[in-house]
Amino acid sequence: MPGWSCLVTGAGGFLGQRIVQLLVQEKDLKEVRVLDKVFRPETREEFFNLGTSIKVTVLEGDILDTQCLRRACQGISVVIHTAALIDVTGVNPRQTILDVNLKGTQNLLEACVQASVPAFIYCSTVDVAGPNSYKKIILNGHEEEHHESTWSNPYPYSKKMAEKAVLAANGSILKNGGTLHTCALRPMYIYGERSPFLSVMILAALKSKGILNVTGKFSIANPVYVGNVAWAHILAARGLRDPKKSQNVQGQFYYISDDTPHQSYDDLNYTLSKEWGLHLDSSWSLPLPLLYWLAFLLEIVSFFLHPVYNYRPSFNRHLVTLSNSKFTFSYKKAQRDLGYKPLVSWEEAKQKTSEWIGTLVEQHRETLDTKSQ
């Protein structure tokens, strides 16, 4: 079906931008609509300088604004929904996270039905599967195994419920009598250039004499490069649009990983930044069980102080578990159904990310030098 169009929500974000960069290379695509609450001026400029004949329409609007979503969805063939509030420490109020991640997704699904959009791809997260306990080991898990987060924390809960809504919407009747087909992708922890998590970590290290904070040394994870996650979304869009593949993709979820070596989060951070003189904190750290119970104690303190003071602990049991579990998943189902193979190798991903970290270090070299004196 030539002349198709795609709406990408959260398009100003870390992953959304990469999806757009790959989308404009797609065959027969006539328009990409990019939606976010606010676009930075440099992001707008990048979209307009993509060097493509494909129309790129920039829309600013709120995922909770139903009228905005209906306008954004008019005439669209595929929606790729990446907009989300990622918050594992409770910076934002619980209701705000639920509104954006769950209600926003429900609003967008309804807008698709009203505008007769036939394909919907949801960017979920591995967090919807757990880990529920740092004591339970899951290595090379897959979709045929039942893994579901039992946390009530707003981020994993909202993403889990939103994914359920997306998959339940598969087969919905559209306003024009057509059928809505949906699928969900569950990426592992995403790293790469412009990662907001890596940015925060590097800047914190530069203010601490180049010492990287140790937060996940007990973990075994399989992080995934942002370019490969973006590629998986492109393949999912192709899959839902291809009559031969669509039957196998509809209503399915897929773990998205790549060939990045399985390692701890701390080892990944060190590998990506060691070239620039950063190193892991070698001082003594609390044993994991003690750290977990300390997090529980801080949560109790926060609960009792809440009526009079908004105390937010820097870590909680969910974050301790997330950062210190042995929890990895295979991408074989995505390979089988979507034809997914990592577009970027580990060596290339490592080099690109490390070079970007180098630019961050260079920008803040004065801070590092001052701290080192």
Curated annotation (Swiss-Prot):
The active site is at residue 155. It comes from the Eukaryota. It is found in: Endoplasmic reticulum membrane; Mitochondrion membrane. It is a single-pass membrane protein. It catalyses: a 3beta-hydroxy-Delta(5)-steroid + NAD(+) = a 3-oxo-Delta(5)-steroid + NADH + H(+); a 3-oxo-Delta(5)-steroid = a 3-oxo-Delta(4)-steroid. Skin, placenta, also detectable in ovary and adrenal gland. The keyword Mitochondrion applies. SUPFAM superfamilies: NAD(P)-binding Rossmann-fold domains. The keyword Isomerase applies. Keywords: Acetylation, Endoplasmic reticulum, Isomerase, Membrane, Mitochondrion, Multifunctional enzyme, NAD, Oxidoreductase, Steroidogenesis, Transmembrane, Transmembrane helix. Its main location: endoplasmic reticulum. GO terms for biological process: androgen biosynthetic process; C21-steroid hormone biosynthetic process; C21-steroid hormone metabolic process; hippocampus development; Leydig cell differentiation; negative regulation of iron ion transport; response to cadmium ion; response to corticosterone. It holds the Pfam family 3Beta_HSD. NAD(+) binds at residue 159. Its EC number is 1.1.1.145, 5.3.3.1. The modification N6-acetyllysine is found at residue 350. One of its GO terms (molecular function) is steroid Delta-isomerase activity. This is 3 beta-hydroxysteroid dehydrogenase/Delta 5-->4-isomerase type 4.
